[in-house]
Amino acid sequence: MAPTEATRGGPADPAPAPEAHRGGHTEHADPAEHAAQFGAQERILTLVWGYISSEILDLATRLDLPDLMGTEERAAAELAASLDTDPVATLRLLRAFAALGLAEETGAGRFRLTPAGHRLRTDVPDSLHAFVRQGMGVFRQAWSHFDHSIRTGEPAFDQVFGTDFFSYLSERPELSGTFTSSMREATRTMSTALAKEEEYDFSSYGTVVDIGGADGSLLAAVLSAHPGVEGVVFDSPEGARDAAATLDAAGVGERGRVETGDFFTRVPGGGDLYVLKSILHDWSDARSADILRTVRAAMPAHARLLVVEVLLPDTVDSSAHPLGYLSDLYMLVNMGGRERSERDLRSLLSDTGFRTTRVRTPPGLTPFSLIEAAPV
């Protein structure tokens, strides 16, 4: 169909400014009102096209574009030649990449990465490359059945793939490796900060047990910062596959050991501090309660539990950052889990044999909070 005056330019063309009719004359609306209306439209269009931003990240990391750009200023034509991509389309991709704050155009057709863009490289300590890759993989596919989760309160992932996420992961070693790498990337900087004594005094505990500790990054940081502490990484055989190597690489292998199992049935006994970092948000209230009861049964009377999670406010207001709420739905759709408020966690702990003793949100750990509890 040939474009008409009504359709030419597509749906993103800004709507005409509202007009007011007075005494037979047409006058433009107040500039402030127009700006507000245009701002609202711009926000909605940005949200509608949010998937394009995700696709840009997906393609950039699949092409290893950030690695190719490295620390140098690069010409779009040069990058296109290296990638075997169309030079004009590559320039357009790079300009969108820059508009998202991941690069800057330093001259006509020349680009370099911003600090955020550098985190998409694979060769930097605080890389988020694997996090992007796993987020744009099987996790994304479940969103085609988002309505199932909202209608039923159950994870759409199970409906799409016929099994739950962690069972699906356990049968696919390559995907499991990507998932573990993504969690390591997301945890690395936070683990180093948490291990510092001013954030939490791990030095007062003889043995720290990291439940669901994956590749051991958190425990390695804790043991490195506190030479008098010993520790245990506990996870499934797949999850803990690289933990011993991580502890050895950090020079703490003699003080840290790895145990494998299912935290729904048992966890190592005899610890002084049990840590659950970003574990409970993977699970429903009922399954989280099962985990907490298992931990409670293993804990000596003097031991403490440290839960590390993002806490949502009891009610959302205009100052609330959307990431926590996006993560909440992400957990629902893919795992059946949820982000919780402080009130939610206190209630969950109380129902499973714990007394909350302290809740802190240290500035250096934002957006995470530390919830300490004692067995009762």
UniProtKB/Swiss-Prot annotation:
Annotated positions binding S-adenosyl-L-methionine: D235, G261, D262, F263
Region of interest called Disordered, as start-end residue ranges on this chain: 1-28
CDD domains linked to this entry: AdoMet_MTases
Class of the enzyme per the UniProt entry, highest EC level: transferase
Pfam family, one: Dimerisation
Active-site residue numbers: H281
Known EC number: 2.1.1.38
PROSITE patterns (UniProt xref): SAM_OMT_II (PS51683)
GO BP term, pick one: methylation
Catalytic activity field: O-demethylpuromycin + S-adenosyl-L-methionine = puromycin + S-adenosyl-L-homocysteine + H(+)
Assigned keywords, A-Z: Methyltransferase, S-adenosyl-L-methionine, Transferase
Compositionally biased intervals (Basic and acidic residues): 19-28
Keyword Metal-binding listed: no
InterPro entries: COMT-like, O_MeTrfase_dom, Plant_O-MeTrfase_dimerisation, SAM-dependent_MTases_sf, WH-like_DNA-bd_sf, WH_DNA-bd_sf
GO molecular function, one term: O-demethylpuromycin O-methyltransferase activity
Family named by the database record: Belongs to the class I-like SAM-binding methyltransferase superfamily. Cation-independent O-methyltransferase family.
Protein name: O-demethylpuromycin-O-methyltransferase
Taxonomic placement: Bacteria, Bacillati, Actinomycetota, Actinomycetes, Kitasatosporales
Gene of this entry: dmpM
